[in-house]
Regions:
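Extended, subdomain-level signal for the structured scaffold at the beginning of enzyme domains
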Residues: 1-98, 102, 111-117, 130-187
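Catalytic nucleophile serine of serine hydrolases
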Residues: 106
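Exposed beta-strand and adjacent loop surfaces of beta-rich binding modules
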Residues: 120
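Anionic-ligand binding patches
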Residues: 123
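Active-site glycine-rich loop that binds ribose-phosphate moieties when present
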Residues: 127
């Protein structure tokens, strides 16, 4: 398992869910990816729901989708802030349109909704935003991880191992089918 040469952005804003930011960030680094924390530009450091800080490497308006292989969006309450910034939505939309991985867990489904990329897709999320996902035109599946082409979604921190395995497999080029649904939860 090697992600050497892969460039991954992890989005951050205040009130991010601690595990949903740090677990994927560290797993991607462990697998060899170059990982950068990308913020909205409103601050240089953001604080998690439980008080843990993360320092950003750049603001979204300083990053080009062409320079990334994936964007990971942690949950918590940060997605409600992230979705308010046009530069964040543009980055997520462009990464998705370029056929690269967009991965969202828990409440992070709000960002792909606001970026307009969920319509016609299969997805999962934290149960509290299930109606939002459905109203955005997605088919909701209650599974630990759902991969539909280059879109990967997951529900809660309990699902982080499957979420990260699926992201890594997608970045390694396995089971990417932009026209169909893939469930890699068994990896």
């Amino acid at each position: 398992m090697s992600l050497e040469g892969k460039r991954v952005a992890v989005l951050a804003e205040d009130n991010y869910q601690d595990l949903e930011l740090w677990y994927p960030l560290l797993r991607m680094r462990e697998a060899g990816a170059q990982v950068k924390v990308i913020g909205t530009g409103s601050a240089e450091t953001y604080t998690s729901k439980y008080g843990y800080p993360v320092t950003v490497d750049a603001a979204a308006d300083e990053v080009k989708a062409a320079d990334l292989d994936a964007v990971i969006i942690p949950g918590g309450y940060a997605p409600d802030r992230l979705r308010r910034y046009p530069a964040i939505l543009k980055l997520v939309r462009e990464v998705f349109e370029q056929g690269k991985v967009v991965a969202a867990i828990c409440h992070a489904g709000w960002v792909p909704i606001s970026a307009g990329i969920l319509k016609g897709k299969k997805a999962t999320c934290f149960f509290a935003i299930k109606d939002d996902v459905i109203n955005a035109g997605a088919t909701y599946l209650d599974q630990e991880v759902v991969q539909d082409g280059n879109l990967i979604t997951s529900r809660t921190p309990d699902d982080l191992p499957a979420f990260c395995r699926t992201i890594i497999a997608a970045l390694e080029g396995y089971n990417i089918d932009p026209t169909g649904f893939q469930n890699l939860s068994g990896l």
